[in-house]
């Protein structure tokens, strides 16, 4: 979609064959000779685009406006469209370069129009040879301009005669942009604006102001410069004497943004010049480099948000005048700062120097610092360039450099005339361009000074000079500013905090860090937000860089805001010295084991397993700690032990006999107070995500909760900004786009490569210029269908715009029904006011098929849904990545879909991950119904807690108290030392745990004794709970991450440590160290670990009422994240696959193809039934990456638990086979069957020990893997097949009489994808293997069976 928009803009900015308005037939010829270029007529451009009708001189009626090197546009005769390519049509490489340049210019145009809006359409007149439009940027300037243009227009001496007009912008930069685009013609600039006008906006200087009189003659080497800056010091000081000795000195400056003062001469000009000459080393941008060069300064205003946008500039820039910036601002303030001894040097211009020299009483008190020595104040310093620290360009007049040569010459002539007629007149009698005193503009509220100063022109100026095009204008200024403009700021690290105490601590850390050599290589800053969600959003939006997040915040930050962990914040009571804080455990009373009689018969020392967890009552420590509720409950939800039906609370309440989760009473606890549980309702933001609509409306209203809270708006670096494109549409700047021929073959061929969107050309290939009667009828039918299916309204909405959203939808639908007679494209344009995207699709709608129109409708509606408009309007790729849209695009635009998906993506996995996407309409509750159900289950869950009010069950110790009191059987806990001490003193056993290498009996849980040192917790746990981490945006570079990590590690061992850790600090009192995280784990999925990750993914899944989940005999799958590791686990990829769950019954099946059928009870398990091979993106620990296909499961069914089940057919059991005399006896060499295989004579029918394919006499089903297959007579090509992944010592026998339902391990893919689980050995079915003395190998068991059979045969004989 973004590419379609970009293509249209690019197509309109090129000279392509077209018969539309603004473009003449033919193509641009190759660049002509230099002489032709000089003599040719220049042509202007409008809206940043070239227009042929600018070539309107006599004889140029068919000329085209063509652009060549150095951005020069001239009128040239075109090459006819029907001329063969060999005659001179541009070669493909030239076309590629031209389109690429057009793309860059279009992006620059869109960026600027967002910063500097275009004038309204009434004032957006096109450039003509007879009109000159002067642009000003204030009301006072406009007053003077109106009088000025009146004089110019009606004066008979202002020849050549022109019509002069004024146009007012809001800033000088906006004026520059308007002139660049042809919406204005001329303006004056001063100081730093002179550089911006020429470099940023491509304007051309034609004249400059100056002051020449007897007292101030023009100095040739300084004629282009308004001011020359000098470094002034007190003559009492020995140092500094040279520029290099300015290092580590204190400096005073007039300021950086104060009005009515010559600021560039005081700061920017000298600093940039000293950087250019190598005096000031480059350590960041020019302000940062200067602050590192000097010791302390007084630069009034430098920390204001106008300049200090990131809030990271060092406080040392205002240390000398922190509380008195206004007092020391301006030239007088800077001199006062110097004279008072606060600073050792200040920077002033030549006018100040001359004023000091004119006073003999103070002249000897100062000296100027030059490159090699300090000098007294004398006239020689003005011509001695070694004493010039900086230069300020004179006020300069700029015009569009793409004006025609004639218009440029006319304007220069008129500037000379303007000076002659109005430059030296009596200001009291006649109009004078340099006089501003006659205009009443009020006074400045800050200073009380009148505002009618230096309007348009400087009052001190008295003449104007035309710039000589053959010479460099203001070269010293451009040289210095070019250096500064290319400087890269220090890596920024703004820490986001959520309370005032942490914010003040962050400010203290910033002040300390700016004085530590290695740490100050980073620009530190602080951001105060209202909540952790706002901090995540700030980091995502690049207004902050770091945020300390606990494990649940880390998960939400990564999943919703694309943030990555950078460093872990080590807690001082962590169980390890790495990133692990604690481990999630569960404990059960020994007396509760009596509920499971089967455990009593297990011999001492043998493992005990609990299968039916639903028989238990549980106690939780509450929702404040991840290990207390989210980790264990989430993991049981993820592996299917607890069926997810409705909300998490409802699922838990349905499953266990009783539950105590303290402090979740519905009267006091809200869903949005918990980051994981609150995602269900978008953290309290109003939403209609569960409202009962019908059909497509239901789908669209249910999708917000199935997608990210924020967007991937920074995912595609080359994407165009939709908001700015909308601005173009609003200002009618895009009408020319649809006058281009979208089906131009050359442009279509370039689309995929140049725009970077493979498949976008599919949208425009084969587009027809007309629609036949059938097509029109089809469009009318489509229009009627969509008008009844879609409620349309304005696409751009804000958070406050959702209260009456349903009513607006109904009203919009009625409007659609009333507009049936309108063309479909017009209806869309009327409905979606302001959307350029709709314009593009309307054009395509008229030319292509209903597939595009359907996609356009879906996209438009998704963009109107809450939380898809508030934050996701920035890039259209966001909408394309929406699951509902992706599923449609994958069918109809498969190539286009591959552009906007991650390397690993699958429709089926996506549907299971966003399960409301497939939830039936009749099972989708309304919001209030859902909330009522949640509250009912909250009430029931807290009954167990509230019925024992005298006992406090809050926290981990409260949960253990709950167990001891007999209220519950089992509780969640943690391996933290303070909790484990309580465990050792309590009559409890650890249980409900997950082994490090799971036995094949999960979701049973092994019960083990609590050892003295709690070492069992290292392997028996629900997963490790990680320490909090500093998260940052996903698209920060590797160098940035290392610079920040290194700086924080150095700060940890410096005087900054007390500001980082302790009471009232940035990290807090419970933490003591920052640990770097390896790049391979700098994503939230691998850092959190598989068990906690799946636990949280299960908690945040959208609620669905899938009735089948708690029914036996049903198998289904849930999508979760998995980590694929390769190359000795040094490379990993993050993928999605399916976890198979369910409780299938035993299945009775008949086996055998011939002979009597046998009926066998077969154990069924939920297993993957469908696999796909998708590309995965592997990242390695050394920064290397590669793409490689991996196989993953996408669907589940009830299947055999084992890959192979062996059985013996009925006819092999006949007694006949016990007598070898039953063989067919050959009658001699002449027997006709001698050369024919006789199956009844095969020896293994009579002696089964001769072939391992038979295991007779075993009436149970043997479930095992066959390691070796042996044939009696090996044939060529048949080899022994060995499976090295199988453990030959594992043997399992299933008793069909006692086993009624599955208890197998969750299918994670260990067997079917060995490369993902290296070192894993398949372990058979779900029943506990025989161990110890009773364990028998398969060979031993087989021999025993055969011995019994042989005994029967001998007895028969």
Curated annotation (Swiss-Prot):
Alphabetized UniProt keyword annotations: Glycoprotein, Ion transport, Iron, Iron transport, Metal-binding, Repeat, Secreted, Signal, Storage protein, Transport
One Gene Ontology molecular-function label: metal ion binding
Subcellular location as annotated: Secreted
Domain of life of the native organism: Eukaryota
The keyword Manganese is assigned to this record: no
Signal peptide: 1-15
Iron is among the record's keywords: yes
GO BP terms, alphabetized: iron ion transport; protein targeting to ER
Record-level GO cellular component terms: extracellular region; signal recognition particle receptor complex
Carbohydrate attachment residues: 198, 227, 304, 310, 402, 499, 530, 541, 572, 578, 625, 639, 692, 732, 741, 1035, 1043, 1081, 1128, 1208, 1241, 1258
Major subcellular site: secreted
Tissue-by-tissue expression: Synthesized in the intestines of the females and males and also in ovaries and testis.
Function: May serve the following two functions: a classical role as a yolk protein precursor and probably shuttle iron to developing germ cells.
Entry protein name: Major yolk protein
Organism expressing this protein natively: Strongylocentrotus purpuratus (Purple sea urchin)
């Amino acid at each position: 979609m973004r590419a379609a928009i970009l293509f249209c803009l690019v197509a309109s900015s090129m000279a392509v064959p077209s018969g539309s308005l603004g473009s003449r037939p033919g193509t641009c010829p190759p660049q002509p000779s230099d002489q032709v270029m000089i003599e040719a007529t220049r042509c202007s451009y409008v809206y940043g685009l070239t227009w042929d009708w600018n070539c309107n001189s006599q004889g140029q009626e068919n000329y085209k406006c063509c652009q060549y090197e150095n951005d020069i546009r001239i009128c040239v005769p075109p090459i006819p469209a029907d001329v063969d390519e060999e005659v001179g049509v541009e070669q493909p490489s030239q076309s590629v370069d031209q389109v690429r340049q057009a793309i860059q210019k279009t992006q620059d145009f869109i960026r600027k129009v967002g910063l500097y809006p275009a004038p309204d359409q009434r004032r957006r007149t096109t450039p003509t040879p007879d009109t000159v439009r002067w642009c000003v940027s204030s009301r006072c300037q406009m007053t003077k301009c109106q009088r000025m243009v009146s004089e110019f227009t009606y004066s008979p001496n202002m020849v050549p005669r022109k019509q002069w007009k004024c146009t007012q912008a809001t800033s000088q930069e906006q004026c520059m942009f308007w002139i660049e685009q042809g919406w204005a013609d001329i303006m004056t600039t001063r100081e730093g604006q002179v550089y911006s006008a020429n470099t940023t906006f491509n304007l051309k200087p034609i004249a400059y102001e100056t002051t020449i009189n007897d007292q101030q003659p023009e100095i040739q080497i300084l004629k282009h410069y308004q001011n020359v800056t000098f470094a002034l010091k007190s003559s009492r000081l020995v140092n500094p004497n040279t520029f290099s000795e300015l290092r580590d000195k204190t400096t005073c400056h007039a300021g950086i943004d104060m009005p009515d003062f010559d600021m560039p001469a005081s700061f920017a000009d000298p600093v940039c010049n000293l950087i250019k000459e190598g005096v000031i080393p480059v350590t960041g941008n020019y302000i940062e480099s200067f602050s590192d060069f000097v010791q302390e300064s007084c630069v009034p205003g430098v920390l204001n948000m106008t300049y200090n946008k990131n809030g990271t500039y060092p406080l040392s820039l205002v240390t000398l005048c922190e509380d008195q910036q206004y007092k020391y601002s301006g030239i007088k303030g800077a001199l006062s700062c110097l004279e008072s001894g606060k600073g050792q040097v200040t920077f002033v211009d030549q006018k100040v120097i001359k004023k000091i020299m004119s006073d003999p009483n103070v002249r000897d008190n100062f000296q100027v610092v030059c490159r090699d020595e300090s000098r007294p104040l004398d006239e020689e310093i003005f011509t001695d360039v070694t004493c010039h620290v900086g230069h300020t360009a004179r006020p300069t007049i700029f015009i569009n450099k793409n004006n025609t040569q004639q218009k440029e010459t006319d304007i220069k002539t008129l500037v000379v005339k303007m000076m002659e007629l109005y430059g030296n007149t009596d200001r009291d009698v006649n109009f004078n361009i340099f006089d501003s005193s006659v205009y009443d503009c009020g006074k400045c509220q800050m200073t009380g000074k009148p505002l009618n100063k230096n309007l348009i022109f400087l009052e001190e100026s008295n003449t104007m000079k035309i710039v000589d095009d053959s010479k460099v204008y203001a070269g010293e200024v451009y040289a210095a500013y070019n250096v500064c403009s290319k400087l890269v700021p220090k890596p920024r690290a703004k820490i986001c905090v959520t309370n005032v105490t942490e914010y003040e601590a962050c400010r203290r850390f910033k002040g300390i860090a700016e004085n530590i050599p290695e740490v100050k290589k980073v620009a530190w800053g602080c951001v105060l937000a209202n909540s952790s969600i706002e901090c995540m959003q700030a980091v995502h939006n690049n207004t902050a860089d770091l945020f300390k997040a606990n494990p649940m915040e880390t998960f939400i930050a990564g999943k919703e805001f694309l943030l990555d962990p950078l460093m872990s914040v080590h807690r001082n009571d962590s169980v390890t010295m790495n990133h692990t804080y604690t481990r999630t455990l569960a404990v059960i009373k020994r007396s509760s084991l009596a509920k499971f009689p089967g455990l009593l018969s297990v011999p001492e020392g043998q493992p005990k397993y609990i299968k039916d967890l639903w028989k238990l009552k549980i106690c939780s420590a509450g929702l404040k700690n991840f290990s207390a509720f989210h980790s264990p409950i989430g993991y049981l939800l993820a592996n299917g032990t607890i069926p997810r039906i409705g909300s998490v609370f409802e699922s838990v309440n349905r499953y266990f006999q009783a539950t105590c989760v303290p402090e979740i009473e519905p009267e006091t606890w809200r869903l949005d107070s918990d980051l994981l549980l609150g995602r269900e309702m978008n953290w309290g933001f109003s939403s209609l995500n569960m409202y009962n609509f019908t059909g497509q409306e239901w789908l669209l209203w249910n999708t917000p909760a199935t997608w990210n809270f924020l967007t991937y708006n920074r995912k595609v670096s080359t994407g165009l900004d939709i908001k700015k494109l909308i601005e173009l549409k609003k200002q009618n700047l895009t009408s020319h786009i649809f006058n281009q021929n979208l089906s131009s073959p050359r442009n279509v061929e370039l689309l995929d490569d140049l725009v970077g969107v493979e498949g976008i050309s599919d949208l425009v290939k084969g587009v027809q210029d007309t629609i036949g009667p059938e097509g029109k009828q089809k469009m009318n039918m489509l229009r009627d269908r969509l008008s009844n299916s879609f409620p349309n309204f304005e696409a751009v909405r804000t958070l406050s715009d959702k209260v009456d959203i349903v009513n607006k939808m109904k009203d919009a639908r009625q409007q659609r029904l009333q507009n049936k007679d309108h063309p479909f494209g017009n209806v869309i344009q009327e409905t979606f006011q302001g959307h350029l995207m709709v314009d593009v699709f309307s054009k395509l709608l008229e030319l292509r098929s209903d597939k595009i129109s359907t996609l356009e409708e879906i996209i438009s509606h998704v963009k109107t849904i809450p939380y898809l408009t508030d934050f996701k309007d920035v890039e259209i790729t966001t909408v394309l990545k929406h699951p509902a849209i992706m599923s449609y695009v994958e069918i109809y635009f498969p190539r286009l879909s591959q552009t906007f998906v991650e390397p690993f993506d699958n429709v089926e996995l996506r549907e299971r991950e966003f399960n409301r996407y497939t939830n039936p309409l009749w099972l989708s509750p309304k919001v209030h119904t859902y909330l009522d159900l949640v509250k009912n289950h909250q009430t029931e869950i807290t009954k167990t807690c509230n019925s024992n009010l005298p006992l406090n069950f809050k926290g981990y110790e409260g949960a253990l108290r709950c167990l001891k009191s007999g209220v519950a059987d089992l509780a969640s806990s943690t391996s933290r030392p303070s909790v484990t001490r309580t465990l050792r003193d309590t009559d409890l056993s650890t249980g409900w745990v997950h082994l490090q290498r799971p036995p094949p009996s999960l979701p049973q849980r092994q019960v083990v004794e609590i050892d003295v040192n709690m070492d069992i917790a290292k392997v028996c746990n629900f997963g490790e709970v990680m320490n909090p981490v500093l998260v940052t945006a996903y698209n920060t570079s590797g160098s940035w991450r290392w610079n920040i990590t290194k700086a924080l590690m150095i700060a940890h061992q410096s005087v900054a440590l007390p500001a980082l850790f302790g009471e009232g600090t940035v990290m807090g009192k419970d933490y003591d160290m920052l640990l770097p995280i390896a790049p391979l784990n700098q994503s939230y999925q691998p850092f959190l670990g598989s068990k906690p990750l799946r636990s949280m993914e299960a908690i945040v899944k959208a609620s669905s009422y899938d009735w089948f989940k708690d029914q036996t005999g049903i198998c289904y799958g849930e999508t979760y994240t998995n980590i694929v590791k390769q190359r000795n686990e040094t490379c990993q990829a993050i993928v999605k696959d399916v976890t198979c769950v369910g409780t299938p019954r035993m299945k009775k099946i008949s086996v055998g193809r011939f002979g009597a059928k046998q009926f066998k009870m077969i154990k069924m398990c939920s297993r993957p039934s469908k696999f796909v091979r998708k590309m995965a993106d592997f990242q390695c620990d050394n920064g290397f990456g590669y793409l490689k296909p991996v196989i993953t499961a996408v669907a589940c069914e009830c299947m055999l638990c084992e890959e192979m089940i062996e059985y013996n057919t009925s006819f092999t059991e006949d007694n006949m086979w016990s007598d070898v005399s039953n063989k067919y006896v050959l009658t001699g060499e002449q027997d006709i069957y001698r050369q024919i295989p006789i199956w009844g004579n095969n020896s293994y029918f009579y002696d089964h020990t001769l072939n391992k394919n038979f295991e007779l006499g075993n009436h149970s089903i043997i479930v095992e893997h066959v390691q070796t297959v042996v044939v009696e007579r090996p044939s060529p090509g048949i080899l022994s097949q060995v499976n090295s992944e199988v453990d030959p010592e594992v043997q399992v026998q299933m008793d069909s009489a006692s086993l009624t339902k599955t208890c197998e391990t969750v299918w994670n893919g260990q067997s079917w994808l060995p490369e993902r689980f290296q070192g894993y050995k398949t372990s058979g079915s779900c029943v506990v293997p025989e161990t110890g003395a009773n364990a028998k190998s398969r060979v031993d068991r087989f021999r025993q069976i055969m011995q019994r059979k042989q005994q029967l045969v001998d007895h028969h004989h």
